[in-house]
Regions:
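Active-site loop->helix "elbow" adjoining a glycine-rich segment at hydrolase catalytic centers
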Residues: 265, 322-326, 354-357
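Alpha/beta-hydrolase fold nucleophile elbow
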Residues: 341-353
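Non-catalytic accessory segments of hydrolases
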Residues: 118, 125-310, 314-320, 583-593, ...
């Protein structure tokens, strides 16, 4: 995507190299020791490079070609004049001096490029050695000390504390940790612990408090199904999981900072904010004028289940969508308290992937969540992945009774957490997503959008081209196969007869050439993409501003896929975590996506001016139906239905 060596890069490298050489040569001619000569070379070279870079890549200089040329000539003339005076003063001819500097001017830029390529090659080789062809899915080498650090628990602080790292909220004073670029607060409770008599009950607000607490360590992740490729299974889990994490950029601003709130992914059954892929340090470090928040919510049998038809189940009327109620409670806490952290409660952008994206879409249609966020970045999620009736959740409740050999709600409430967790592991196939109940979530989410339920919310919607392999890498081959066959078998429930016939005919032709599992995987992936595309249409028809993004990058290891994992890492700048997931981040692409996300959060136009990011041309992200297409490390804006992709093939098949 980024040009490896633009003319601007050449000018900066050329003048900086002259600076390195100038520092070394002057020091040597002055009789300084070798060590001092090297030090002088490095100091002058780095200082000059930083100074020249700020000038050359400033918005004013990049505004026109004439400005750029004038700037290059002026800088070069000033520097050469200074060098000439210095060299003549020391009695050395300019020709001798330039011969001395030749190695610096030519060699240093080339050496820097070679070193960067070697580092990248080493990282790729290390990943390939660990993952092989990727057929085993995600295999994490989690260090014991990292697990122990993540699993530490915050404690009350009875005595003195560091006031510089403390923030007073309505629910307590929280003492975080400060580093060079951010201050972080981890494991802050946003609701009463849903344990004991509050198990399977709606989240309750915390009382006001003046107590002081540590906020240095992540709270426990939700109790969850532990899949083969889930990293969160290595960390502490508990029913007491309703906590959030806040990272504040170090830049002081006159006005409150915009806020980015992350909803974690995991198919509503696994995942959590302790996943290194979702860490919030790097984004506010790069963009210090904003606040980043992530949080946990209840999952699986603790978050999405219907007890209404079992004895005593009427006492838990909200169990059907508890995970969504937790999310609303988190957003309410954020809106009430984020001002204490320097955030703006009226400029909240939510971002979610997979089930996190689906959650956001449901909350956008939910009256109870009205006004809790103003913008949404959703990737690979759709309201069509939720249930239209509570039948499946009621069946799950009955299965849970059988698995735990209980017969009443009272019996379930008395069970130990581990007993329920073990039962959930055996019931993973039957786990439920949220349900449109007509109470919290409208019966018809698309109609709600049409009627203006999501009015006032801007959307960026993302689609991936290779998400199925990512899912396989997370859950393992057997679970993946079971899930794909089940999902495709359920498709007729969402299709009219004509469309269903077209889909089955398409599937039959694909199966003949690639095998049943691969064909159904492709169909599932394509169908999800079409559902997301339809979502963009519905939101636009409802009057919402919509931008579309299509991720079509190839994965480093084909069998691991390229989708949510790569996008999350690129947007949040978590390159080290991405290596754990078997890939290497394209730093240029990540920088561009982070810049566009920051503009979106801040309310600026979604465009890049020339060389705003060094080596990247001007770019304008036009509104839907145009899409930002990310492919082969490059950006372009076009409609995705003009691409010769499998999505287009399926669309054409249905149209026929």
């Amino acid at each position: 995507m980024k040009k490896i060596f633009t003319f601007d890069d050449f000018m900066v490298a050329f003048i900086a190299a002259l600076g390195y050489g100038f520092g070394e040569t002057i020091a040597r001619l002055s009789g300084w020791p070798s060590v001092m000569c090297v030090a002088a070379s490095i100091v002058l070279g780095i200082a000059l490079e930083e100074f020249i870079t700020k000038i050359v890549f400033s918005k004013a200089v990049q505004k026109s070609t004439m400005n750029r040329v004038f700037t290059y000539v002026a800088i070069l003339l000033v520097f050469l004049a200074g060098q000439y005076v210095s060299i003549r003063w020391m009695g050395v001819s300019m020709l001798e001096y330039l011969q001395e500097e030749f190695a610096f001017v030519v060699g240093l830029p080339i050496l820097g490029l070679i070193v960067n390529l070697l580092i990248r090659r080493y990282r790729i080789r290390k990943i390939r050695k660990r993952y092989g062809d990727g057929s085993e899915g995600f295999v994490f080498d989690v260090k014991k000390e990292d697990i122990e650090e993540t699993n530490k628990r915050n404690q009350p602080i009875p005595g003195g504390y560091d006031a510089d790292c403390a923030v007073k909220t309505r629910t307590g004073i929280f003492v975080g940790e400060k580093n060079k670029k951010t201050t972080s607060y981890f494991g802050i409770p946003y609701a009463k612990p849903p344990v004991g008599e509050r198990r399977w009950k709606a989240p309750e607000p915390l009382p006001s408090s003046e107590l002081v607490f540590e906020a240095k360590y992540f709270g426990a992740s939700a109790i969850q199904v532990e899949h083969k490729g889930s990293i969160v299974k290595h960390y502490r889990q508990s029913e007491d999981c309703l906590t959030l994490n806040i990272c504040v950029g170090g830049k002081k601003t006159e006005s409150p900072k915009p806020v980015l709130v992350l909803f974690h992914h995991g198919d509503f059954t696994f995942g959590g904010s302790a996943d290194p892929l979702l860490y919030g340090y790097n984004y506010p470090s790069k963009h210090p004028d904003m606040v980043f928040v992530s949080f946990n919510y209840r999952l699986g049998i603790f978050g999405f289940i219907d007890f209404s038809e079992i004895p005593g189940g009427k006492d838990c009327p909200d169990a059907l969508n508890l995970g969504l109620l937790d999310q609303i409670a988190a957003l309410e806490w954020i809106k009430e308290n984020i001002g204490a952290f320097g955030g703006d409660p009226d400029r909240i952008t939510v971002i979610g992937f997979e089930s996190g994206a689906t959650s956001i879409l449901l909350l956008a249609a939910c009256e109870k969540a009205k006004g809790l966020f103003q913008k949404a970045f959703i990737f690979n999620g759709s309201p069509t992945s939720v249930y239209n009736s509570p039948d499946a959740s009621r069946a799950l409740a009955n299965d849970l009774l059988k698995a735990t050999q209980t017969s009443t709600m009272e019996g379930l409430l008395q069970l130990e957490t581990e007993t329920l967790k073990d039962a959930a592991q055996g019931l993973w196939k039957n786990m439920c997503a949220p349900t449109c109940d007509g109470k919290l979530i409208p019966d018809d989410v698309y109609q709600a959008y049409h009627d203006g339920a999501a009015s006032g919310i801007e959307f960026i919607i993302g689609i991936t081209s290779n998400e199925a392999q990512v899912f396989r890498s997370l859950v393992g081959d057997q679970k993946y196969s079971d899930e794909i066959f089940s999902a495709v078998a359920d498709m007729p429930n969402y299709l009219d007869d004509i469309t269903a016939d077209a889909v089955w005919a398409y599937l039959e032709t694909q199966t003949a050439s690639m095998g049943e599992l691969e064909a159904k995987s492709k169909l599932f992936e394509q169908w999800l993409a079409l559902c997301i595309y339809r979502l963009a249409i519905k939101l636009k028809e409802g009057g919402n501003p919509v931008h579309l993004m299509y991720w079509d990058e190839e994965s480093l290891i084909e069998n691991l896929g390229s989708g949510t994992v790569d996008v999350v890492a690129a947007l949040l700048g978590n390159g080290d975590a991405l290596q754990m997931y078997g890939s290497v981040m394209n730093a240029d692409l990540s920088e561009a996506l982070q810049t566009l996300l920051h503009k979106y959060i801040s309310g600026n136009a979604l465009q890049l001016y020339p060389n705003e990011i060094k080596g990247i041309d001007a770019f304008d992200w036009k509104a839907f139906p145009q899409a930002l297409i990310v492919s082969d490390g490059k950006f372009r804006c076009n409609t995705i239905d003009d691409r010769n992709t499998e999505i287009k093939e399926l669309l054409d098949y249905i149209k026929q």
